[in-house]
């Protein structure tokens, strides 16, 4: 059974709350490090579930090219800032975060009020700057998903004129790199390898959890292959043995036994294999001596007939 160690040799949290971890996996046989690294990287980058802002509503705004009175950023800039929010939602439904801010103020992600199902990772992420005497009223729609989801112009939410859709990037892992290092020589002189895997997340998930989720996805993907059973193709029958194809003439039977079998439509050994000793005795003019002769001839080529017929 394959056995190896998994060590986390480095772990850091950046100022923007993104997290990075470095894992060393080994020892592995030659080629296994690349196999593991490639499969894990693909799942980590595109297969993990994450949380993203999918739509924004701004009071008094009905299209993305508008401006908000008293707000330094135009609507496009506000949408781009909302796209940078890093959130973690435990709900399967769409969650809504709201804020109402009076100027002067610098509006950040921490000003958004969500239910207890959603937490804001990068609370310092800027959203907008509101001047004195003005206000900004805004809500964001948050969903869980996998990969990248472009704006759906035909969706129900898109029909609402004041709800501005955003291309959603759900991927919680930002970057994955791996290298393969050769280590000591194993049994039989074969080279051994170690996989060095670096995982960088947006902070909504730890590198340890990301690695565990990716591994479980791969296990679920490969598990059905462990119980594959190949169905037989319909219509296929086992090929008859060479002995069963021997013609009756080659058994060197007596003339009496040969003629009786021929009259009973027995032309080869394969025809005889459907008979028992009792069946042979029922052939017209076929006595015990002829039956014994047939049994002996078949035994010489490795075939034996049952004494009595089988009953269902």
Curated annotation (Swiss-Prot):
Instruction: Give me the ranges of the annotated region Alpha C-terminal domain (alpha-CTD).
Output: 241-312
Q: What Gene Ontology terms for biological process does this UniProt record contain?
A: DNA-templated transcription
Record InterPro entries: DNA-dir_RNA_pol_insert, DNA-dir_RNA_pol_RpoA/D/Rpb3, DNA-dir_RpoA, RBP11-like, RNAP_asu_C, RNApol_insert_sf
Q: Which GO terms describe its molecular function?
A: DNA binding; DNA-directed RNA polymerase activity; protein dimerization activity
Positions of region (Alpha N-terminal domain (alpha-NTD)): 1-229
Annotated function: DNA-dependent RNA polymerase catalyzes the transcription of DNA into RNA using the four ribonucleoside triphosphates as substrates.
Q: HAMAP family annotated for this entry?
A: RNApol_bact_RpoA
The text of the family note is: Belongs to the RNA polymerase alpha chain family.
| Protein name per its UniProtKB record | DNA-directed RNA polymerase subunit alpha
What is the taxonomic lineage of the source species?
Bacteria, Bacillati, Cyanobacteriota, Cyanophyceae, Synechococcales
Q: Which gene encodes it?
A: rpoA
